[in-house]
């Protein structure tokens, strides 16, 4: 028997958001992990807000919404807030009820900016890594950098001397970051990572990935220049080595095969397993390093860092960052790296349970 189409809406609903979300939905475990991380940041959140005044959007709501933006490739805050209005899964993850009003996108952005001006991203990243510590190697790492296109056009790249060049016709002109600056984003630099590619206004994002499961152990963004990748790698290794004195290995591509990088890494008690660069020069990596099987093994794990960048720039929000200024770009880069690790954790936890099942009582 054919059923009738019912046009009239129900006035009341007896189904909760909790019931709408499947019990085996991947976001359920991520929500639990996220709540544990946010619970450890209460002191940081309290320090950001005045004791009196009009209540803001809860910072927990903002951070959960930003995680959804990374997980589901939502292009803008306007679209994110729009989806929060009608997407029941998004409402459940953020913590809104069926009847809660959704914020205006401009209000959401202002509340997000308050978090951008703090160390919340670094603390969030550190807490996620604390949960993931059992799955992370503390001996073997890979380091690399990637280009992040800035939210600024080529036409905004104008001479620093204040000449009348409006930037609209730059054909045949020689332009560089030494003589020009973007009026839209002064921290962005004209840069390209390889020959044959066009130069773009960009930043550089850097990650230190552990070689066991490909989780991100350290992350930072910098302005784009020819030394930034090696300088950032040494800084991340230095911060990591301050927490432990044991010797570690780090793999990298040919760009890291320089005398200063290798020498400084050795001072930090780091064995450098970089791809040898012998094109017109002598490599700083000799037989004392390459003869060990660990050297080839480190190079074979470099795909882990490329896979990480693939997610950050393909699914995540970092192909072209929609924030301006190095501080904000660094914040969203570190937060996106935390989202990457958070997304990986449920599967790693499930694998551990399968490998180490609980003993059954007699």
Predicted regions and their residues:
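Charged, often Cys/His-bearing segments associated with DNA-binding zinc-finger transcription factors
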Residues: 1-36, 345-362
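Secondary-structure capping and boundary motifs in well-ordered enzyme cores
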Residues: 22, 26, 53-61, 76, ...
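Basic, short loop/linker segments at the boundary and entry of helix-turn-helix/winged-helix-like folds
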Residues: 23-67, 72-73
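Hydrophobic, well-ordered secondary-structure elements that form the walls
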Residues: 65, 80, 104, 207, ...
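DNA-recognition alpha helix
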Residues: 79-91
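Polybasic low-complexity intrinsically disordered regions
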Residues: 85, 94-264, 277, 340
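Helix-centered, glycine/charged polyanion-binding patches within enzymatic domains
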Residues: 162-167, 254-327, 331, 353
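C-terminal extensions of enzymes
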Residues: 317-353, 358-362
């Amino acid at each position: 028997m054919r059923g009738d189409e019912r046009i009239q809406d129900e006035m009341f609903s007896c189904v909760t958001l909790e019931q709408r979300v499947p019990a085996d939905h991947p976001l359920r475990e991520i929500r639990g992990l996220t709540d544990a991380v946010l619970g450890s940041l209460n002191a940081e959140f309290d320090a950001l807000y005045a004791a009196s005044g009009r209540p803001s959007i809860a910072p927990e709501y903002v951070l959960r919404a930003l995680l959804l933006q990374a997980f589901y490739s939502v292009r803008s805050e306007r679209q994110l807030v729009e989806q929060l209005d009608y997407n029941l899964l998004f409402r459940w993850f953020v913590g809104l009820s069926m009847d809660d009003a959704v914020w205006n996108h401009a209000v959401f952005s202002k509340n997000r900016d308050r978090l951008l001006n703090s160390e919340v991203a670094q603390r969030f990243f550190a807490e996620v890594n604390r949960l993931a510590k059992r799955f992370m190697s503390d001996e073997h790492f890979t380091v690399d950098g990637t280009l992040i296109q800035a939210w600024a056009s080529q036409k905004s790249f104008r001479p620093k001397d204040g000449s009348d060049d409006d930037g609209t016709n730059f054909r045949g002109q020689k332009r560089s970051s030494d003589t020009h600056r973007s009026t839209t984003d002064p921290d962005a630099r004209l840069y390209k990572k390889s020959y044959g590619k066009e130069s773009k206004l960009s930043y550089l994002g850097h990650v230190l990935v552990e070689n066991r499961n490909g989780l991100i152990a350290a992350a930072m963004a910098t302005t784009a220049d020819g030394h930034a990748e090696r300088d950032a790698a040494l800084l991340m290794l230095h911060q990591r080595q301050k927490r432990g004195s044991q010797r570690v290995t780090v793999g990298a591509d040919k760009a890291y095969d320089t005398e200063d990088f290798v020498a400084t890494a050795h001072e930090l008690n780091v064995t450098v397993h970089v791809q040898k660069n012998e094109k017109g020069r002598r490599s700083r990596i000799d037989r004392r390093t390459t003869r060990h099987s660990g050297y080839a093994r480190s190079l074979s794990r470099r795909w882990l860092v490329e896979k990480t960048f693939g997610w950050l720039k393909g699914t995540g929000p970092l192909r072209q960052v929609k924030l301006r200024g190095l501080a904000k770009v660094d914040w969203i880069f570190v937060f996106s790296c935390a989202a990457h690790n958070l997304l990986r954790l449920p599967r790693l936890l499930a694998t551990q349970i399968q490998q180490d099942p609980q003993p059954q009582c007699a």
